[in-house]
Amino acid sequence: MATQRRSHNDRIAAGEEKEASFKAEAVLGEKSNIAPAVPAHIIYKLLGFTLAMIIIPISSYFLTLNSIFRGNSTFAGATAAIMANVVLVGYVIVAMKEDQSEALEAAAAKETKTESKKEL
């Protein structure tokens, strides 16, 4: 069984366009939330770890290639891979600590809110 799509004129005749415009006016009367979805300090932290993920492994490869491993690119590449994993583990640790601190702040705020309600 096929369904029909109603054209713009059919919707106007049915009064759906007026309902939509009334809803739009109601929404426009409210203040919109223009705050960013992610706080700036998190973006800066992510950018820092992104740069570290690029710079540290590449620099460790070239620094160890001729100075420590005397031209052995396999060991220098392994060093770069290890350093990339070190940066990754560092990011995970920082992210977990930040998540825990946000949870503690939320719990403290909730606790103060319940205490203030009890006082009233």
From Swiss-Prot:
Motif (Prevents secretion from ER): 117-120
Cytoplasmic compartment residues: 1-37, 96-120
Keyword terms, alphabetized: Cytoplasmic vesicle, Endoplasmic reticulum, Membrane, Transmembrane, Transmembrane helix
Stretches of the chain found on the membrane's Lumenal side: 59-74
Keyword presence, Chloroplast: no
Superkingdom of this protein's organism: Eukaryota
Recorded GO CC terms: endoplasmic reticulum membrane; endoplasmic reticulum-Golgi intermediate compartment membrane; ER to Golgi transport vesicle membrane
InterPro entries per the UniProt record, alphabetical: Vma21
Residues annotated as transmembrane: 38-58, 75-95
Membrane topology field: Multi-pass membrane protein
Subcellular location: Endoplasmic reticulum membrane; Endoplasmic reticulum-Golgi intermediate compartment membrane; Cytoplasmic vesicle, COPII-coated vesicle membrane
Family annotation (Pfam families): VMA21 (PF09446)
Single GO BP term: vacuolar proton-transporting V-type ATPase complex assembly
Function field: Required for the assembly of the V0 complex of the vacuolar ATPase (V-ATPase) in the endoplasmic reticulum.
Assigned protein family: Belongs to the VMA21 family.
Protein's name in the database: Vacuolar ATPase assembly integral membrane protein vma21
